[in-house]
A protein has these predicted regions:
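A recurrent domain-boundary module in secreted/ectodomain proteins
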Residues: 248-293, 496-538
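Generic structural signal for beta-strand residues in well-ordered domains
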Residues: 13, 17-19, 67, 337, ...
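Sec-dependent, cleavable N-terminal signal peptides
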Residues: 1-22
Length: 590
């Protein structure tokens, strides 16, 4: 077997010096056996398997901990802009017997010379959606659909809202076609009735051919002479460096006990022990510059996931359960059960932002809801860098009442209590017993998005429930927060992470650095000097009450010689021209 393998590699795999730039990069693929769990564990008992020296079970950032880790799937990153992969083939072969035995083949050599080895391929169709892929796009291919624990096809792609991921299930025959040479599979007979993809952990090889037959990705995988070695049936091989067109089989691929399906990879540095995160910024920057405004409007900064009967960091009032133990607390509430209840924090990314009539939409596993903002004048002109906290509990119940004090220098935080009907007109939820004013934050894959008064999406999903989240698992004794400086383009792809050591309601986030364990504080400096201005609301009904009248005139005169929503002609100054526009609409809806 070893002699034959060496001979075939010599024929199929080019030398390192001949490797050329590629439009697609293999970023990750799932080698977890269908009856096993990521990291360790087999059968039902594996659900809570904890490996020696670790405090929790290993998980995937998208699906958590599931048997089989989502079935067979492979993930690509588009490394060259405007890539056309119509007619491309992804070819795979399993060259060594697994611990459960390989499938029985029909002897057909679909592409690999030995038809007795399990092999197959899938081909991208001529569908136009494959003709112009943008750099930085993540493409996952799944064997199983959602009902079977995998994922159905979803080609949504909205980079200006942070969505760079497309998933294709092999059942989507208009997008892909697949074949293999299996006659039977005694170890997993159910797979014979599904889509044709099989990923093994021992000496599983893959290559990608362009439509003209040239190699886009030469043969790679365990045993092909590259860096990948010793993949187990509990593991996921993944790229541990940033994707570029020059990635090849000799790049830093390694097996891992965690995975990040549909999101950039993360790993622990073997030297420093620090958590590292794959960056797509270099690939995506030109695309964002072409398609999107450099200035987003608003971003999620932090939210509370601590359950009402638990403390931040767990433990008791006197001591948390962290290592080493301490007294984890919030900067506003101190160390209290529930850490202040349901709350989240936003940061304004563009100056003079008008949020009147906006709807904030939250979701978690099984539940969702909305927070409808009123047309109060307060929402009509929010300044860049403002921190806005939303909280359900009043001060009397351990939360905080509305406080809109703000001076732009020493005080840049406002608090909105969602029971305040002057600011929040309505909240909704499909949770039993919901009453208006209530909302939820939690550790159950929670996320938040926003729509403006017209219903247009203005903030894509952000939080641990967003597909591109690749921080630590948020548990019921954590907050989730942005572990990075706030920037004009901050979206759901930014580095969000869990924290059970501290939270900072209404303040800049903090975190512990690595490898030097010092406290780092979030900076707003880049944001505040960005010059980002929110687009004008475009109408003279400045208070949004449905009629242009004296109240709107008062708002305009109060903004005289300044900027903001009252700059109706968008020339940068509120002056007589804007007054003329307002008076010309007097008594109308605007």
């Amino acid at each position: 077997m070893k002699t034959r393998t060496a001979a075939v590699i010599a024929l199929l795999a080019p030398c390192a010096t001949a490797l050329a730039a590629t439009e697609l990069v293999i970023n990750e693929y799932n080698s977890v056996r269908d009856d096993r769990w990521l990291g360790c564990g087999e059968g039902a008992a594996g659900a809570t398997c904890i490996r020696a020296g670790e405090s929790s079970s290993d998980t995937d950032t998208f699906r958590g901990r599931t048997i089989g880790n989502g079935g067979d799937w492979i993930e690509f990153v588009v490394a060259v802009d405007h890539a056309d992969i119509r007619g491309w083939k992804v070819q795979w072969v399993s060259t060594a017997p697994s611990s459960t035995g390989l499938p029985v083949t029909n002897g057909t050599a679909l592409w690999y010379p030995d038809g007795n080895l399990p092999q197959g391929e899938f081909t991208f169709s001529q569908d136009a959606r494959w003709s112009d892929l943008r750099a930085g796009t993540i493409i996952t291919i799944t064997r199983d659909g959602t009902a079977a624990g995998g994922l159905d096809t979803d080609l949504s792609f909205e980079p200006c809202l942070g969505d760079w991921w497309m998933n294709v299930n092999l059942s989507s025959s208009s997008l892909v076609s697949a074949q293999w040479n299996f006659a039977s599979f005694p170890a997993f007979p159910n797979l014979m009735n599904g889509n044709k993809l099989y990923i093994d952990h021992q000496n599983w090889w893959v290559q990608v051919l362009r439509a003209d037959g040239s190699e886009a990705i030469p043969l790679m995988g365990e045993g092909t002479g590259g860096t990948l070695c010793c993949v187990g049936s509990y593991e996921v091989p993944a790229l541990r460096e940033d994707p570029t067109p020059n990635i090849n089989t000799f790049s830093n691929y390694s097996d891992a006990n965690s995975s990040s399906f549909g999101a950039p990879n993360t790993w622990k540095d073997t030297v420093t022990g620090c958590r590292k995160r794959q960056s797509m910024d270099a690939l995506r920057a030109p695309v964002l510059a072409q398609l999107c405004s450099p200035c987003r409007l608003i971003a999620l900064n932090e939210y509370n996931a601590v359950k009402s009967d638990r403390f931040l960091g767990g433990g008791t009032l006197a001591q948390d359960a962290n290592t080493p133990p301490g007294t984890a607390s919030d900067a506003q509430f101190g160390r209290v059960l529930g850490n202040g209840g349901n709350w989240f924090e936003l940061v304004v990314l563009s100056d003079h932002l008008d949020m009147r009539g906006w709807t904030l939409e939250w979701s978690e596993t099984g539940y969702s809801g909305t927070i409808a903002l009123s047309n109060a004048a307060f929402w009509g002109d929010l300044r860049i860098g403002t921190i806005i906290t939303f909280i359900e509990r009043t001060t009397a119940l351990g939360g905080l009442n509305t406080d809109l004090s703000y001076n732009g220098t020493t005080d840049t935080w406002v608090n909105v209590n969602t029971q305040d009907v002057s600011l929040v007109s309505l909240t909704t939820s499909n949770k039993p017993g919901h009453v208006s004013g209530a909302f939820t934050t939690s550790n159950d894959k929670w996320s938040l998005r926003a729509k403006d008064s017209s219903g247009a999406a203005v903030m894509g999903s952000m939080g641990a429930g967003f597909a591109s989240y690749n921080g630590g698992t948020v548990n019921a004794e954590d907050v989730c927060r942005l572990r990075a400086d706030v920037a004009p383009g901050t979206d759901g792809n930014a580095w969000f992470d869990d924290s059970g050591s501290s939270s900072t309601f209404g303040r800049a986030n903090t975190w512990t650095g690595c490898p030097v364990a010092s406290t780092e504080t979030q900076s707003f400096a880049t944001l505040l000097t960005s010059g980002c201005e929110a687009p004008s609301s475009g109408g003279p009904d400045l208070n949004g009450d449905g009629t242009v009248d004296g109240q709107d005139l008062g708002i305009l005169l109060g903004s005289w010689s300044g900027t903001g929503p009252a700059d109706l002609n968008g020339d940068g100054t509120v002056d007589g021209q804007d007054l003329g526009i307002l008076l010309g609409s007097w008594g109308t809806p605007g």
